[in-house]
């Protein structure tokens, strides 16, 4: 079988079964990032489960677009993103995108969504001045940054994930889909999806790695209590990557009746764009609240990055504000040199996984390397394509913190502010130890507290002395 591949990327065998083609209908969208189009060449590849398809060529427009206008008409963020999926999913993705764009301008839909976010989810979430954490980072001369927490942990279900789950459930209802599937790592997206399915009377199936089910037993019980069927995934590493693969296989089989609520800004177009837009409320509220609290904008934004949805929800509003630093923090696990980490943007290379081109953790043959993080929500070998794009153009910075550093930050916030953060959030909090000594006095730092840590207490007990 002749297929087309991009020599800048590698293939891997863990993404999709079946034949593939790239998204190839450029006429329906107005965006274009042709400037970043990857070079292509045709080569023959023997029997593989996921091919890197040839990028569609198109004429350059006379006027170069803003490079930060994204995605383009192919669902690409520069060379990242796209739609590398089985033929059976093309119609569903096109239908989903059409519905999303239509409902974006539907005032009835938006009013219903806003009402649910306010009365059911509990938005807006507070922008909280962490006074004692701020004092902790004061230098001997009394100077230092001011730290604010965007309290997504106070949302219904305890994390930012509910923003996207509610919106996609409403979208699924408009599409006439009665069955919902989702993947989950830490369990927060699974709980959020099970919650909205209970709210709207939809059948719910959650795929979760067997290893993650063991370390997130509380969330497994919560999902089942809410009426969801939780299916354990034992293949591969039995973590988030494998749960995502199983969810996609289910979707391929049941695409007519089923909507897949993907939980991050990853996957094939339009998911990275759509999930970003549903989480953009985080950044929009932050801008408004910052103006109310100190009459300006944040100077620095900090968020943890696994797939990257909470970070993108915070960052998106400020991407065009060049004076606002955006910092994503990945999981360094046992350390970058150990090989046991999930620092995709720090150590990864470009490839295709789960329908999109992005940075991945992979070996010389393009096979996915098993990631590691004490945090189930960061334990993923890929990352959202827009994060890859922001990294490559230098708009966002990405660093990483180890399991040990995250655990110390978990304890630190608990004792200084009386807030028990999720282990995912704890990675972002841990980076403050390195960041704060470098910041000028009075710098306004907003850190996205993406989730609460109740779910992680069982894990923390094994590692922390309190």
UniProtKB/Swiss-Prot annotation:
Role, per record: The beta subunit is responsible for the synthesis of L-tryptophan from indole and L-serine.
Subunit structure: Tetramer of two alpha and two beta chains.
Keyword Chloroplast: yes
Similarity annotation: Belongs to the TrpB family.
Enzyme Commission number(s) from the entry: 4.2.1.20
PANTHER family: TRYPTOPHAN SYNTHASE, TRYPTOPHAN SYNTHASE-RELATED
Pathway, per record: Amino-acid biosynthesis; L-tryptophan biosynthesis; L-tryptophan from chorismate: step 5/5
Modified residues (N6-(pyridoxal phosphate)lysine): 161
Primary localization class, coarse: plastid
Keywords associated with the record: Amino-acid biosynthesis, Aromatic amino acid biosynthesis, Chloroplast, Lyase, Plastid, Pyridoxal phosphate, Transit peptide, Tryptophan biosynthesis
Protein's UniProt name: Tryptophan synthase beta chain 2, chloroplastic
InterPro entries reported for this sequence: Trp_synth_b_CS, Trp_synth_beta, Trp_synth_beta/beta-like, TrpB-like_PALP, TrpB-like_PALP_sf
SUPFAM superfamilies the UniProt entry points to: Tryptophan synthase beta subunit-like PLP-dependent enzymes (SSF53686)
GO CC annotation: chloroplast stroma
Organism (species): Camptotheca acuminata (Happy tree)
rRNA processing listed as a keyword: no
The organism's place on the tree of life at top rank: Eukaryota
Pfam families per the UniProt record, alphabetical: PALP
Subcellular location: Plastid, Chloroplast
């Amino acid at each position: 079988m002749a297929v087309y591949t991009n020599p800048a990327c590698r293939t891997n065998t863990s993404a999709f079964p079946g034949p593939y083609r790239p998204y190839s209908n450029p006429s329906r969208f107005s965006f274009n990032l042709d400037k970043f189009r990857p070079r292509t060449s045709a080569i023959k590849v023997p029997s593989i489960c996921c091919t890197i398809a040839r990028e569609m060529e198109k004429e350059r427009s006379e006027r170069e677009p803003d490079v930060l206008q994204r995605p383009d008409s192919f669902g690409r963020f520069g060379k990242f993103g796209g739609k590398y999926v089985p033929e059976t999913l093309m119609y569903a993705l096109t239908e989903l995108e059409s519905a999303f764009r239509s409902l974006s301008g539907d005032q009835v839909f938006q009013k219903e969504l806003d009402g649910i976010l306010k009365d059911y989810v509990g938005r807006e979430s507070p922008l909280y001045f962490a006074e004692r954490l701020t004092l902790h980072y004061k230098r001997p001369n009394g100077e230092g940054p001011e730290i604010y927490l965007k309290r997504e942990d106070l949302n219904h279900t305890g994390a930012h994930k509910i923003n996207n789950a509610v919106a996609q459930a409403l979208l699924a209802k408009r599409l006439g889909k009665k069955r919902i599937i989702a993947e989950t790592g830490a369990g927060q997206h699974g709980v959020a999806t099970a919650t909205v399915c209970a709210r709207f009377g939809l059948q719910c199936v959650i795929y979760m790695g067997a290893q993650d089910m063991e370390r997130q037993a509380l969330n497994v019980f919560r999902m089942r209590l809410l009426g969801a069927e939780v299916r354990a995934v034992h293949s591969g590493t039995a973590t988030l990557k494998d749960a995502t693969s199983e969810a996609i296989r289910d979707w391929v089989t049941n695409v007519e009746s089923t909507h897949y609520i993907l939980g991050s800004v990853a996957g094939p177009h339009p998911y990275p764009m759509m999930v970003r837009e549903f989480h953009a409320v985080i950044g929009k509220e932050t801008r408004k609240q910052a103006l109310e609290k100190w009459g300006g904008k944040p100077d620095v934004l900090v968020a943890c990055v696994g797939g990257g949805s909470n970070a993108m929800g915070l960052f998106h509003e400020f991407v065009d504000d060049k004076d606002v630093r955006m910092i994503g923090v990945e999981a360094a696990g046992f350390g970058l040199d150990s090989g046991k980490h999930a620092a995709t943007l720090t150590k990864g290379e470009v490839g295709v996984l789960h329908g999109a081109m992005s940075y991945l953790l992979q070996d010389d043959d393009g096979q996915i390397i098993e990631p590691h993080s004490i945090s189930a929500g960061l334990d993923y070998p890929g990352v959202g394509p827009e994060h890859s794009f922001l990294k490559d153009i230098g708009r966002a910075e990405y660093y990483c913190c180890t399991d040990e550093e995250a655990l110390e930050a978990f304890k630190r916030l608990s004792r200084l502010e009386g807030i028990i953060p999720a282990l995912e959030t704890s990675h972002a909090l841990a980076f403050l130890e390195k960041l704060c000594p470098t910041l000028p006095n009075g710098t306004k730092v907003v850190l996205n507290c993406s989730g609460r840590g109740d779910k992680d207490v069982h894990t923390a007990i094994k590692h922390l002395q309190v």
